[in-house]
Amino acid sequence: MKPIKTYDIKEEELAKTAYATIKTNKGNITLELFYKDAPQAVSNFVTLAKEGFYNGLNFHRVIAGFVAQGGCPYGTGTGGPEHRIKCEVAHNPNKHQRGSISMAHAGRDTGGSQFFLCFVDLPHLDGEHTVFGKITSAESLSVLDKIKQGDIIESVVFSPSL
């Protein structure tokens, strides 16, 4: 099994990346990242994105009324980085609501690079997957609604504020 990676990024540093914009071939999806509630998931997402990991990957799993999932380097849902991260669900108050971004995994503490965006509220996933952010605008939700399987993540950029 891949080793668990733990990030030691200070909250002040994470605050500089409090907002993410996932640039797709359908438009931009802007999210607020919950770095106080899910610091490891946010650190992992930010680190991978800044390394260019997500650039050019696709949304390999899109199920209407459920989720749009991306972040697999193979485009199949079977890949990830050479590490995994722990789930952060115990003290995370965030729920799987329409527009939430959450870590995908194949079992507790197996998340790596794959994430999903919720098309609708999915309360049955609460406590199972780490919610680490949420879409900030109706415009971004509209872009999410246009995502289809195979659509491309062009890049991910960050800012401290909107």
Curated annotation (Swiss-Prot):
It catalyses: [protein]-peptidylproline (omega=180) = [protein]-peptidylproline (omega=0). Residues 16-162 form the PPIase cyclophilin-type domain. CDD domains: cyclophilin. One of its GO terms (molecular function) is peptidyl-prolyl cis-trans isomerase activity. InterPro entries: Cyclophilin-like_dom_sf (IPR029000), Cyclophilin-type_PPIase (IPR024936), Cyclophilin-type_PPIase_CS (IPR020892), Cyclophilin-type_PPIase_dom (IPR002130), Cyclophilin_A-like (IPR044666). Gene3D superfamilies: Cyclophilin-like (2.40.100.10). Keywords: Isomerase, Rotamase. Disulfide bonds: none annotated. Its EC number is 5.2.1.8. PROSITE patterns: CSA_PPIASE_1, CSA_PPIASE_2. GO terms for biological process: protein folding. PPIases accelerate the folding of proteins. It catalyzes the cis-trans isomerization of proline imidic peptide bonds in oligopeptides. PANTHER family: PEPTIDYL-PROLYL CIS-TRANS ISOMERASE-RELATED (PTHR45625), PEPTIDYLPROLYL ISOMERASE DOMAIN AND WD REPEAT-CONTAINING PROTEIN 1 (PTHR45625:SF4). Belongs to the cyclophilin-type PPIase family. This is Peptidyl-prolyl cis-trans isomerase. It comes from Helicobacter pylori (strain J99 / ATCC 700824) (Campylobacter pylori J99).
